[in-house]
From Swiss-Prot:
Entries under PROSITE patterns matching the protein: CYTOCHROME_B559
Subunit annotation: Heterodimer of an alpha subunit and a beta subunit. PSII is composed of 1 copy each of membrane proteins PsbA, PsbB, PsbC, PsbD, PsbE, PsbF, PsbH, PsbI, PsbJ, PsbK, PsbL, PsbM, PsbT, PsbX, PsbY, Psb30/Ycf12, peripheral proteins PsbO, CyanoQ (PsbQ), PsbU, PsbV and a large number of cofactors. It forms dimeric complexes.
Subcellular localization(s) per the UniProt record: Cellular thylakoid membrane
NCBIfam families to which the protein is assigned, alphabetical: cyt_b559_beta (TIGR01333)
Cofactor(s) demanded: heme b
Stated name of the protein: Cytochrome b559 subunit beta
Protein function: This b-type cytochrome is tightly associated with the reaction center of photosystem II (PSII). PSII is a light-driven water:plastoquinone oxidoreductase that uses light energy to abstract electrons from H(2)O, generating O(2) and a proton gradient subsequently used for ATP formation. It consists of a core antenna complex that captures photons, and an electron transfer chain that converts photonic excitation into a charge separation.
Similarity remark: Belongs to the PsbE/PsbF family.
GO cellular component annotations of the record: photosystem II reaction center; plasma membrane-derived thylakoid membrane
Bilayer-crossing regions: 23-39
Record note on cofactor: With its partner (PsbE) binds heme. PSII binds additional chlorophylls, carotenoids and specific lipids.
UniProt keyword list: Electron transport, Heme, Iron, Membrane, Metal-binding, Photosynthesis, Photosystem II, Thylakoid, Transmembrane, Transmembrane helix, Transport
Length: 47
């Protein structure tokens, strides 16, 4: 029955870094996107 315990022993708890390449890529796209969506939404009221 030690075979069922083996996968649980292999899992080790990691503290993942916040600033990763994925984080930079996501925010480099997300922040301007939210800004432009807000700007486009604001333009709708400039009539």
């Amino acid at each position: 029955m030690s075979n069922s315990q083996a996968p649980m022993q292999a899992v080790e708890v990691r503290v993942y870094p916040i600033f990763t390449i994925r984080w930079l890529a996501v925010h480099a796209l997300a922040i301007p996107s939210v800004f432009f969506l807000g700007a486009i939404a604001a333009m709708q009221f400039l009539r």
